[in-house]
Amino acid sequence: MILVDTSTIVAWLDRSHPDHKTASQALVTVLMEDDVAVSVVTLAELAVGGRTREALEADLKGMIVIKVTAADAWRAGQVFARLPRKHATPLPDFFIRAQAAERGWRHLTNDRRRLGWWPDLEFVFGN
């Protein structure tokens, strides 16, 4: 199973995004390799962008939507707490990475920041 990050979904959905081609190719590759999931956190982040729920559901058809568990929330909070405040990043990124880490899944993302905070997480990037 591969958990796809919001950054990849955003680039894939937006044909004018500078990473659109890379994200699209990466998604095609992982869809051929494994089952693909997105977090409910990604749904929340995408809802801010003004898409309708119906359009979003159609775009993500075939992807498994996973909920945040208590274990995911705990792990996200523990890692976030270790991050120096001057480098704080949005907590949603930590929820999504915690979900992948807790399940032992690979994580497809365009966001290469703060990878070292997740030593047991296998990151996948489009080339």
What residue spans do the PLM features occupy?
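Acidic, PIN/NYN-like endoribonuclease modules and their adjacent C-terminal/linker elements
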Residues: 1, 97-127
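Short, well-structured N-terminal submotif of metal-dependent ribonuclease cores
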Residues: 1-37, 47-58
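Short loop->beta-strand "edge-of-pocket" segments that line small-molecule binding or catalytic clefts
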Residues: 2, 35-37, 62-67, 106
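Histidine- and aromatic-rich ligand-binding microenvironments
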Residues: 5-7, 38-39, 89-90, 111-112, ...
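Alpha-helix capping/helix-boundary segments
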Residues: 8, 42, 72, 95-96, ...
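A general structural signal for well-ordered alpha-helical segments in protein cores
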Residues: 24, 43, 53-56, 73-76, ...
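Short, hydrophobic beta-strand segments that form beta-sheet elements in well-ordered domains
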Residues: 39, 46, 105-109
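Active-site neighborhoods of divalent-metal-dependent phosphate/nucleic-acid chemistry enzymes
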Residues: 65-110
